Amino acid sequence: MNQEGASHSPSSTSTEPVRARWSPKPEQILILESIFNSGTVNPPKDETVRIRKMLEKFGAVGDANVFYWFQNRRSRSRRRHRQLLAATTAAATSIGAEDHQHMTAMSMHQYPCSNNEIDLGFGSCSNLSANYFLNGSSSSQIPSFFLGLSSSSGGCENNNGMENLFKMYGHESDHNHQQQHHSSNAASVLNPSDQNSNSQYEQEGFMTVFINGVPMEVTKGAIDMKTMFGDDSVLLHSSGLPLPTDEFGFLMHSLQHGQTYFLVPRQT
């Protein structure tokens, strides 16, 4: 019936016609994102069929739609990762020339702070965040990455696997209706090539945060820090406090839309 869509289908067993442009519903996006974040980024044929059957509870979908969604999602994830690494490298390079000057100024107490505050370049932070950076040591041990960074907001102000996921969405689908819609101009700036079949759902289930001053589009809920950034990085809030992760490398709390964060090397 739709020969063009069927010709590109990865040997689909679905009997329904494949729509050339599939706009998944919020409930379907939530399921797909949960599966992707659980580590299944390239499901085999039998898993694709299972996912498609689960998505059909909320609207028409074909195996090819599921296949291409995961293909596009992997591409976007790799692109965001490259953009973040490039932004981090550029930020570290731009502050390198001023590093020595900042540290000399701090050691000479030209920019004194009270006993309860220390200036790290992005506003005054309490002793709690200061102790995280200084570890009770002299200011000369502050990592150079923190010096010169500034926050646009000013000063400080379990995954149970694929099987449980399928079981959960078999009888708890009502929670999916709590999905909120966020519209962000940053998505079109960072991903101009995705303004086709994906344009209607990229903004659903996503939010925009600022990491090292760069607007980034991330998923709501738990984020796999280990997969996205590796074992040697820590994500900090603009207040200077590190975001805790569980034993599997997932953030224990969701990022907040519009907030500023910093990706820094883990201290040893």
UniProtKB/Swiss-Prot annotation:
GO terms for biological process: adventitious root development. Residues 1-22, 173-198 are annotated as: Disordered. SUPFAM superfamilies: Homeodomain-like. InterPro entries: HD (IPR001356), Homeodomain-like_sf (IPR009057), WOX11-like (IPR044558). Keywords: Developmental protein, DNA-binding, Homeobox, Nucleus, Transcription, Transcription regulation. Residues 1-16 have a biased composition (Polar residues). GO terms for molecular function: DNA binding; DNA-binding transcription factor activity. It is found in: Nucleus. The keyword Nucleus applies. Residues 17-81 bind DNA. GO terms for cellular component: nucleus. Its main location: nucleus. Transcription factor which may be involved in developmental processes. Belongs to the WUS homeobox family. This is WUSCHEL-related homeobox 12. It comes from Arabidopsis thaliana (Mouse-ear cress). The lineage of its organism: Eukaryota, Viridiplantae, Streptophyta, Embryophyta, Tracheophyta. The gene is WOX12.
